[in-house]
């Protein structure tokens, strides 16, 4: 029953429902992992800027919104990639795309274009260091920069680096 519901949700591109069904089943030790991680296409370039790989963008979407296009966070972030409206407006201008707050929660391609473009910009800002770009995407670059200046991030990075060796 759960696999059928998750499969139907996937077929009609309601990945958020497929994830919810799979999560409920996994709590009861019935796993339907192929529905927990939907696959859809993401842009390779947005106005000339190369975007990180499809799987990476999908992992951000999975974590941020669980593929719920209409997701709205308590902080005000919107859509699949959970963009703050002000950030989305700035990114739309940088990417030479029209800004529309309503499209953040109604147009998956638009939300993914803006979110991908924004993430790639953060990746450039942090010299290709994915953990920093991910942290900046999640908490905001100002917050991350403050933490870097406090040496907290350097200490955590050193521990992570030693652990990976």
Language model: regions and residue ranges:
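Catalytic glycan-binding domains that act on GlcNAc-containing polysaccharides
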Residues: 1-165
